[in-house]
Structures are given as structure tokens and as C-alpha cells.
């Protein structure tokens, strides 16, 4: 009983997206499993919209996700985890591929591969906003429900995509990630959970995870 109250025994289901698969995520999971070997951990890949529904229903205990709209966030608790700079994902043969960094206005004539807004509204709206601030409205070549699909579409020559720099782990040999030099060309990653479903195991996990966050 005492071990349960200390969060050393139990189960934990963690939601994540492909945007949360940088080096920090495996490190957190490994550290938590090392310290709490009697906690059964389940990992579930989801889109940000799916995270919201799963947290509210109690299907998952915690999620690495994007900030929610204020109306959706009323029942959730958030902690900022890191700010992820955007990179432009493009073919190695692209004229801009060899540049050390670019401004988003240099992509004004490109077709954009975007996240499906129904699944990732924060990221979609951020890209649209960045383009508007640069003086243009992006030509949307295609949308995808996942970063892996976006990268596949770029590889197929369907356009360019803006993805967080941690997505570098996904790129193939034919693609490059070029950093964006624009101010505010980034998107936040948060840890979210539902206070009404909070338990000792969740608190133990938050203690481990939040020690590894990057402050804004």
C-alpha cells in the first residue's frame, strides 16, 4: 500500500506524437522505467486532437502534446516542456537546400505540405500565421494527419513542409532540414494531464519528466 501511495507501483499510459520523439522522449521513458520498475508503462502515438479526447476520457494519463485552445483546456492542466524551432523540410535538390538558414518569405512560391487542421490545429494555424506575417498565403499542395506522411509527400516532390527540428530523426537520405531564421518560427510542446485523474504514479512521472524540460 505504501509503495502505491508513493507512486512506485501501478500503471501509466502516455500519449505522444511523432513531434515528441526527439532524444528527450526516449531519455525520459528510460529514466522513469529505471526508477520505477514496478510501474507498467504503455505508450500510445496520437495526434494532438486525439490527446485531448483521450485525456478527458481517462484513456491516457498524460500526454506530450501541443497547447490546446482555451475552451478545450479548461479541464486540463499544462506545463510548458520546450519550444521547438521550425525547419523547412525539402529535397536535397531544392535550390535552397544548401543554405544554412532561410526566411519563410523565400518559400512564398512553394507548395506547402501541412498538418491536417482537424488533427493538429495549433501547428496548422502557426504555419499559416508565419506565412501571413511574411506577406503571403501559402499554396497548399497537400495535407497529412502525421509528420511521417508529410515527410513522405516532400520526398515524393509534392512540396515543402515546416516541421520542428526534432523531426530530423525521420528524414530520409534524399531530404534536408533547413532552419528558419524568422523570429517566432517555433511551436511549443507541453505536458498535459487531467487533474481529476491525477494519481501517485502520474505525479512520479511528472517529477521525472519536468526535470528534463527546456525553459522558454
Residue ranges and their predicted role:
Residues 1-5:
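Alpha-helical linker/hinge and terminal dimerization helices associated
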Residues 9-71, 144:
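Central regulatory/effector-binding core of bacterial HTH transcription factors
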Residues 15, 86, 95, 102-122, ...:
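Short loop->beta-strand "edge-of-pocket" segments that line small-molecule binding or catalytic clefts
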Residues 35, 46-109, 167-171:
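Acidic, Gly/Pro-rich loop/turn segments at junctions of secondary structure
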Residues 47-60, 66, 117-176:
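Hydrophobic hinge/microswitch elements
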Residues 72-79, 84, 89, 148-195:
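Beta-alpha-beta core module
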Residues 105, 188-216:
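Extended ligand-binding regions for polar small-molecule ligands
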Residues 110-134, 199-207, 216:
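Secondary-structure junction motif
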Amino acid at each position: 500500500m505504501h509503495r502505491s501511495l508513493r507512486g512506485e507501483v501501478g500503471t501509466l499510459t502516455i500519449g505522444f506524437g511523432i513531434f515528441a520523439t526527439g532524444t528527450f522522449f526516449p531519455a525520459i521513458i528510460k529514466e522513469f522505467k529505471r526508477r520505477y520498475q514496478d510501474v507498467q508503462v504503455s505508450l500510445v502515438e496520437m495526434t494532438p486532437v486525439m490527446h485531448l479526447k483521450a485525456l478527458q476520457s481517462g484513456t491516457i494519463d498524460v500526454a506530450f502534446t501541443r497547447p490546446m485552445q482555451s475552451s478545450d483546456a479548461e479541464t486540463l492542466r499544462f506545463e510548458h516542456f520546450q519550444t521547438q524551432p521550425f525547419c523547412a523540410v525539402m529535397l536535397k535538390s531544392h535550390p535552397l537546400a544548401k543554405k544554412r538558414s532561410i526566411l519563410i518569405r523565400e518559400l512564398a512560391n512553394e507548395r506547402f505540405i501541412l498538418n491536417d487542421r482537424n488533427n493538429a490545429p495549433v501547428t496548422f494555424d502557426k504555419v499559416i500565421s508565419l506565412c501571413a506575417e511574411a506577406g503571403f498565403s501559402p499554396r497548399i499542395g497537400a495535407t497529412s494527419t502525421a509528420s511521417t506522411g508529410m515527410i513522405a509527400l516532400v520526398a515524393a516532390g509534392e512540396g515543402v513542409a515546416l516541421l520542428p527540428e526534432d523531426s530530423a530523426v525521420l528524414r530520409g537520405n534524399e531530404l534536408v532540414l533547413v532552419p528558419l531564421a524568422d523570429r517566432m518560427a517555433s511551436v511549443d510542446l507541453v505536458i498535459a494531464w487531467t487533474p481529476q485523474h491525477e494519481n501517485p504514479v502520474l505525479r512520479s512521472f511528472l517529477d521525472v519528466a519536468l526535470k528534463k524540460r527546456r525553459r522558454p
